Amino acid sequence: MPEGDSVYRLARRLRPALVGHRLVHAELRVPALATLDLAGATVTEIVTHGKHQLTRVVRGDGEALTLHTHLKMTGSWTVVGAGKRLPSRLMDTVRVLLELDDGATAYGLDLPVVEVVPTAQEDDAVGHLGPDPLRADWDAAEAVRRLAAQPDRPVAAALLDQRNLAGLGNLWVNELCFLRGTSPWSPVGELDVPALVALARRCLRHSALVEGAYQVTTGDRRDGRSHWVSGRAGQACLRCGTPVRVVEEVPGDAERRRTWWCPHCQPGPGPEPGRTGPAPATQAWDRPLAAGGRAARLTPRSRTGRSRPGR
């Protein structure tokens, strides 16, 4: 499933094509909205909250509406220029069609979530979400409060819960646990939650905003080396050489996503009941992301407190 940084980047690409343009024809191909006519409305904003996209429009009579969509596992958006059409093989997957006054058309394909709400009532759609590190109204203290409210919950499951902190998906949760040097099954109450939240914000913003850094956590964009643990089951840990492990289910996660971790670099509870490792409090991952326009490598501190060089 696309994560918050993915949806943020998608919205950024869609804005030049849609914002400020009038809809000359619109189709919302879901039963509940089949009769809603948005023709004549002007697209005013495209914003995101976590993995949710909010496309705001104002109709000719001044009514402000928001098209709320979510990609989940199947959805995508594409824009074709004037005089061009979407390939016919894809037309059956169209859930949203927005024809613009310059002749371009935006298509939302295979979108599992399509709804329209009054803009003043957007909270009906996204009000349950936690703070989003990519939004201007980001509230770190509130994210910390929500996570800390369930001290016994495994950290990976807590981070995946969009009600705590919006935008983190499986890739970033796995990488954050590695970067903080903690087992994905460590209870939230045993961790430095403010430091975890600060790192999550820094990583998401770096990935979303820095050219060439999208979802690269190691600073190395080569295939198989862009992530510390995600997708690297059975391969040697890039830090210590221990084989990376994977399990199919995150405790408490209904979507049964995979969890990757290095047993040596991420001490603490394991996925098996009762299994534990060395206490995680002896390590911290805190090297800042590079400010330049390239991927940055985050590396851990050793138990002596000296930074290990990236390798």
Located regions from the model:
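Gly/Gly-Pro- and Ser/Thr-rich, intrinsically disordered tail segments characteristic of DNA damage-repair
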Residues: M1-E115, A236, G292-R311
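Phosphate/anion-contacting hairpin/loop surfaces
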Residues: G62-E63, L67-L168, W172-G181, L191
